[in-house]
C-alpha cells in the first residue's frame, strides 16, 4: 500500500478552556508524527499492513527523527525524497476546549519536491512505465 503526500511534525497546543483572539491560557504542547499520508499509514499499520511512504522530508535533524519514528512504527521510508537544503515540514495548531482555533501548515518542502516524490513509480524501484505499480494507493488530496 502506497501512502503519497504529507509526512510532517504535528505541533499541537491544547488548552482546556475556551479561547478568544489574544488569549494567553495554560495548556499542553505536543509534537508527534502527522500529515495526511502519515495518518493514513499509521492507521493501516495498526491493521497489520506495511505502508510505503512517498513524500518529502528535509535532510535535517528533525527529518532524521521523523524518519526514525516512521521506521520504528514499521512504515517503509526507503523511497522518501530527502533534501539537504530544505527543512522538515510542520503543522502547528491551537486547540481550545471548543475545538480548533487556528492552524498553519508549513509544507514547503513537499511543495518544492513536487513530482520528485513519485520517481520510485517510474525508475524501477516501485514501478516503470512498462510495469506500473499495481497495488493500492492512498493519495493526499491536498497535493497540487
Model-derived segments and their meaning:
Residues 38-45:
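Histidine-anchored nucleotide/phosphate-binding helix
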Amino acid at each position: 500500500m502506497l501512502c503519497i503526500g504529507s509526512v510532517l511534525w504535528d505541533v499541537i497546543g491544547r488548552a482546556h478552556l475556551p479561547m478568544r483572539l489574544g488569549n494567553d491560557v495554560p495548556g499542553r504542547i505536543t509534537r508527534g508524527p502527522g500529515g495526511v499520508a502519515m495518518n493514513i499509514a499509521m492507521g493501516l499499520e495498526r491493521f497489520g499492513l506495511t505502508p510505503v511512504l512517498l513524500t518529502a522530508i528535509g535532510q535535517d535533524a528533525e527529518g532524521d527523527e521523523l524518519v526514525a519514528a516512521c521506521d520504528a512504527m514499521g512504515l517503509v521510508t526507503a523511497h522518501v525524497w530527502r533534501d539537504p537544503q530544505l527543512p522538515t515540514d510542520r503543522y502547528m495548531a491551537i486547540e481550545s476546549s471548543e475545538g480548533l482555533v487556528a492552524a498553519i501548515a508549513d509544507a514547503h518542502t513537499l511543495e518544492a519536491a513536487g513530482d520528485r516524490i513519485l520517481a520510485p513509480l517510474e525508475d524501477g524501484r516501485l514501478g516503470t512505465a512498462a510495469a506500473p505499480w499495481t497495488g493500492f494507493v492512498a493519495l493526499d488530496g491536498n497535493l497540487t
